[in-house]
Structure formats: C-alpha cells, structure tokens
Amino acid sequence: MGRSELELKTILITGASRGIGAEVATQLADRERHVIVNYREKTRRANDIVKAIRDSGGNASDARADLCDEGATAVMFDDIARLFGRLDVLVLNASGGLERGADPGYAMRINCDAQERLVRLALPLMPPGGRIVFVTSHQAHFLGRRPVPADYVPVAASKRAGEDALRAMGPILEANGISLVVVSGDMIDGTITVRLLEQRDPDAVAARRAVAPLPTVSEFARAIVRGIQEPVQDGQTIYVGGPDYLD
C-alpha cells in the first residue's frame, strides 16, 4: 500500500453490503476517501459494492465481521489499524432484531451492546476531528413519545438504548475531539425492515404511508452523507421524513 493511500480519509460503514449502508458507501465514492464495507455474510454483495466504488474512481475494501462477535470485531479494527493507521469516520448503520428466528436478546446485542463496543474499539484509531454517525429510526428515537408497531417494539427499545449509550459517552468523545451525529428516519421505503414489517403488520406500514411518502433509500443515504461531511453541532440529530414526528 502506497503512502498516498495511507493518507486517504478512512470511513468504516457497518452493514454496508446492501440497502442503506451500500447506498451510503457508493455515494461516498471519492479519490480522497477509502470506504470500508463491513458485512456479516453476503460476500458477493460486499464485493459488488467495493467494485462499484472502484469503478467510479473511488477507493474501497471489504471487512467481514459479525458485529456481535467480539473477537471478529477486534480483528476488524486491528486490520484497519494495520492497513490505514487510523479511522476518520465510523458509520453505525447495521442493525437487526426483526429477522425470523432471532432470539429475544439479539436485538439488544446488535443494536446496543455491539454499537457501544464498536465505538470503544474505534476510539484509539480516531484522530481529533473524527466523527461517529449513528443511524436510527423515528420509531426508536421517539420511543415513549409516539406509538410503535408491536412487532417493532424490541427493535425500537434496543436502538433507543444504543443511542442513549452513545450519548452517555459524550464526555469521552469530546475529550478525544470526536463528534457524534445521529441520523433518524421514518420507515425507509425499499429496506428489509419495511418488507419484514409489511409481512407482520401491514397496517402499521400503511399508516406511515398515509401520513407522507416514505423516504427512499437514496434520500436517507444522502442525509447520512451530510452527517458525515457537513459541519454539525456535536450530538445533533438529522431527521428524515415523518413530518408528524416533528410537530
């Protein structure tokens, strides 16, 4: 690896082999950045995203790691340290809990415990001016203030717990010169989350569509990219869709 590559801005996006994470990765394609596409098991999809970024003139690589596996995530960050020497941006996009057959504790492990662990692993690699972007949903962000579809409650509660855990790390992040941005969206059209909810509770999805058109994957990804690139106030939340949540 040449010295010029070591000087690129390095961005790790979790859950980036498909959906929102993949779209964020492709929107970030640039000669001045190196995008690391994290994925759990969809190797071909991750490779396709990396190839698309490279074909457009950007720089990218993949990093396979189950975020609930402490050993695998530690190895992933060791590899980032060895290959790039630092991590400028951590995008916490991966989440779960609606999958068929998921055990009752999985949502909390992936949406809260893993998120906090990733930040603690990333901190030693992040220079002052680095940024952490936490991706969530309005149903989680506004938990307790707005109704939540019954099937989504465990996910919403775990994602809210994850956001709270990261915000509680504010003094540590500030001491290291790291900013935290939260990007919250209504149900995002075309995502696996909405497809699973439509199977379990179609009325809940229809109710959200009745309020306003659901944001698309591309629209939501653009908001995440803004959260990465633009000057923002530390701890700021960027909202996408769901105008009734903001009344």
Language-model regions, residue ranges each:
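Rossmann-fold scaffold of SDR-type NAD(P)-dependent oxidoreductases
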Residues: 14, 87-95, 111, 134, ...
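Conserved glycine-rich cofactor-binding loop
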Residues: 17-19
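Conserved glycine-rich Rossmann-like NAD(P)H-binding loop of the short-chain dehydrogenase/reductase
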Residues: 31-48
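The beta1-alpha1 cofactor-binding region of Rossmann-like NAD(H)/NADP(H)-dependent oxidoreductases
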Residues: 43-44, 63-76, 112
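Hydrophobic positions on the long internal alpha-helix
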Residues: 76, 91, 118-122, 126, ...
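Catalytic loop of short-chain dehydrogenase/reductase
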Residues: 95-101, 131-175, 187-189
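Catalytic Tyr-X3-Lys loop
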Residues: 101-119, 123, 129
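C-terminal helical subdomain
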Residues: 178-183, 199-247
